Amino acid sequence: MRPHDADSNDLSALDPAMIDRVIAQARVDGVLLEIETEQEWIEDKGIPFIVRWITSLVSKDAARARAAGEKRAGFNPFLPPDPKLIIGDLGPDHRVVLNKYPVIQRHLLMVTRRFEPQTAALHESDFRALALTLARLGGLGFYNGGSEAGASQPHKHLQWIPATPGGAGLTRFTDRLSAAPLLEPHHRSGLPWRHAFVRHAGPLGVNAEQLQQAFLLACEATGLPPAADPMPPYNLLADSQWLLVVPRSREQHEGISVNALGYASSLFVRRPEQIDLVRRIGPLDLLTAVAT
């Protein structure tokens, strides 16, 4: 299934104007609790990493509310989602929802309409949702496969953030792979953790079949069983050209949590004093410590 074959109803949830209208109304209604951060750049072996931390008291309260909600037994914020956070349906199996506690503006979630565990294998419909999003909006899609990979909710959800100057992205890692063939796994020298990059997009752009094929190739290259139930922990990241898979061993190292965006050179700490800890450990060693 190629993006231009999609029903127009599928794409209405990915209309930037619609997204911005829902964001604006969610702010007015007080249901969008944006977390304000400051940031610092840390370079490690020539690779720049952006490290964000919470700054305002309001944002700290929002972060505490998020943590409390995540710990409520049986609480599922996606079944159903807050209607004021819903952008719209994305095919028969997914809906597009605003992240209630965004660190990055316009952070979207592609949530399954029926419950599936976050550790379940990814299906054709998941890659369809991801391909439609990347084809329409560009940016970066990602998936935290289980709590050890940084997932905060057990209900299956892919995520998307827009491309911004100096923001999270794969280009800092794929710059050396520019001549790599299509649909072949590649290892990027200088990255000490197990991983596989696969170029998935050809002249016709992003499509679900090639995105899924790229994922299967990356799983084979990294030793992940793509149809396991449950899947071992892993991170998936994809932009309009590349897909990256990183198997994971644990969610945090020395109190610093890492999700998929860490492998897009973007880290988040809760307290500014943890910046020095990231600097002491080194971003590359931090990412290696939580990988396999």
Q: Can you describe what each PLM-predicted range is?
A:
Residues 84-85, 95-100, 130, 141-150:
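Catalytic micro-motifs at enzyme active sites that drive phosphoryl/nucleotidyl and oxygen chemistry
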Residues 92-94, 106-107, 137-143, 154-158:
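Generic beta-strand structural signal
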Residues 112, 146-171:
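Histidine-centered divalent-metal-coordination microenvironment in nucleic-acid enzymes
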Residues 114-136, 142:
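Intrinsically disordered, low-complexity linker/loop segments enriched in Gly/Pro
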Residues 117, 132, 148-151, 288:
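Short, surface-exposed, charged/polar-biased interaction segments
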Residues 134-138, 162, 181:
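Short, well-ordered alpha-helical segments in soluble proteins
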Residues 139-152, 227-239:
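A short glycine-rich, hydrophobically flanked beta-strand micro-motif that places a catalytic Asp/Glu
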